[in-house]
Curated annotation (Swiss-Prot):
Keywords: Antifreeze protein, Repeat, Secreted, Signal. The concentration in blood serum is about 0.2 mg/ml. GO terms for molecular function: antifreeze activity; identical protein binding. The lineage of its organism: Eukaryota, Metazoa, Chordata, Craniata, Vertebrata. It comes from the Eukaryota. Transmembrane segments: none annotated. Thermolabile, displays irreversible loss of activity and aggregation at room temperature. This is Antifreeze protein Maxi. It comes from Pseudopleuronectes americanus. The keyword Repeat applies. Detected in blood serum (at protein level). Detected in liver. Contributes to protect fish blood from freezing at subzero sea water temperatures. Lowers the blood freezing point by about 1.1 degrees at a concentration of 0.1 mg/ml, and by about 1.5 degrees at a concentration of 0.2 mg/ml. Binds to nascent ice crystals and prevents further growth.
Length: 218
């Protein structure tokens, strides 16, 4: 097609050139130019016919190729559609299997949770009973400790009272002993003082008698 357009363009350019230069040539040259133009027109017509034939052949080949390509495309599309259907079926089967697996896993999880809850409840009850027993034992130990402390306090109080009584008795005995000793000491001192006084009086009388006798002596 491009070749035919180029050939027609050449013919038009040649005809234009001939038309421009026609007034400047002699009749013989004009006749030769006309003959050449006629021949060129025939050649251009032949070229156009050949180009049309080539274009028709190319169009036929292109149409056949397009038909083959379309058939191949349809086959490809059909194959892709079949593959898509197969993939969709596989996906549906996989989804079904996944749903079944999920349901089974959920059921297993529920059963496991129930078992764990039961275990937790049993452990909680055991822990509560153990805690209650421990609390009762602690309360009993506290009561025992309190009773022992009260008994120890009573013993200490009794011992303190006995010690206080013993101290009071000892103080009373010591006071009585001291009073007796003081009375004895006082009596002893009084007797000694009386004896000393008598001795002193006797000595004084003797001295007086001696003095009188000395004074009476010649």
């Amino acid at each position: 097609m491009a070749l035919s357009l180029f050939t027609v363009g050449q013919f038009i350019f040649l005809f234009w050139t001939i038309s421009i230069t026609e007034a400047n040539i002699d009749p013989a040259a004009r006749a030769a130019a006309a003959a050449a133009a006629s021949k060129a027109a025939v050649t251009a017509a032949d070229a156009a016919a050949a180009a049309a034939t080539i274009a028709a052949s190319a169009a036929s080949v292109a149409a056949a190729t397009a038909a083959d390509d379309a058939a191949a495309s349809i086959a490809t599309i059909n194959a892709a559609s079949a593959a898509a259907k197969s993939i969709a079926a596989a996906a549906a089967m996989a989804a079904k299997d996944t749903a079944a697996a999920a349901a089974s896993a959920a059921a297993a999880a529920v059963a496991s949770a129930a078992k764990a809850l039961e275990t937790i409840n049993v452990k909680a009850a055991y822990a509560a009973a153990t805690t209650a027993n421990t609390a009762a034992a602690a309360a009993a130990a506290t009561a025992t400790t309190a009773a022992a402390a009260a008994a120890a306090k009573a013993t200490i109080d009794n011992a303190a009272a006995a010690k206080a009584a013993a101290v009071a008795t000892a103080v009373s005995d010591a006071a009585a002993t001291a009073a007796t000793a003081a009375a004895v000491a006082a009596a002893t001192l009084e007797a000694a003082a009386a004896k000393a006084a008598a001795t002193a009086v006797s000595a004084a009388a003797a001295a007086a008698a001696a003095a009188i006798a000395f004074a009476a002596a010649p």
